[in-house]
Amino acid sequence: MSIDMLIKKIASTSDCRLFEADGLPVIDEKHQLPKDISEFYEQCGGAVLYENADYPIYIVRPAEFELANPIIVGELCEEDISSEWYIVCTDGKGEYLTIDLNDQRKGKCYDSFFDRHGIVGETQVIASSFTDLIQRLLENKGKHWYWLRDDYVSLGDAYDGIEIE
């Protein structure tokens, strides 16, 4: 499904709403936004999915699309791969989903809840791209996080194939 179609689906789904466009996220100069993220923020300024459900999720506003480590850990941790992850969604209660903007892993989305963010073997890949993430979150309809269900087919861990010193 394209970003345009997902935006239309958000707009037409009860308990979901789009925020007014507010420009593109400003990111570190060494990173580039994936095309689907640019397309999304050119049309809207974030969204809330299933606002009144048990598990609402907010696609952050452009100003909140920030490097994750300073927010979640309190420092950048430049030596770790998580230093290139940006906050893309929040539950509104201090838990986050992140997206990797490293060229080799660009677009992969991770479960960055406080108890697993940046922990080898605990940071699940929950979507292969921003588009994939939004589609999965819409299909989940505000129920318990899809990647924590028993029937979830794993996409691996953020640290798979990474040499840890």
Swiss-Prot record:
InterPro entries: Knr4/Smi1-like_dom (IPR018958), Knr4/Smi1-like_sf (IPR037883). The keyword Cytoplasm applies. Disruption phenotype: Deletion of the yokI-yokJ operon has no visible growth phenotype, however it is out-competed by wild-type cells. Gene3D superfamilies: SMI1/KNR4-like. The keyword Repeat does not apply. Keywords: Cytoplasm. It comes from the Bacteria. It holds the Pfam family SMI1_KNR4. GO terms for cellular component: cytoplasm. It is found in: Cytoplasm. Induction: Expressed on rich and minimal solid media likely in early stationary phase; not dependent on DegSU. Not expressed in liquid LB, but only under conditions that promote biofilm formation. Probably interacts with cognate toxin YokI but not with other non-cognate toxins. The interaction inhibits the toxic activity of YokI. Immunity component of one of 6 LXG toxin-immunity modules in this strain. They promote kin selection, mediate competition in biofilms, and drive spatial segregation of different strains, indicating that LXG toxins may help avoid warfare between strains in biofilms. Mediates intercellular competition during biofilm formation; disruption of the operon disadvantages the bacteria, but overexpression of the cognate immunity protein restores growth in competition with wild-type. In situ neutralizes the toxic effect of cognate toxin YokI. This is Immunity protein YokJ.
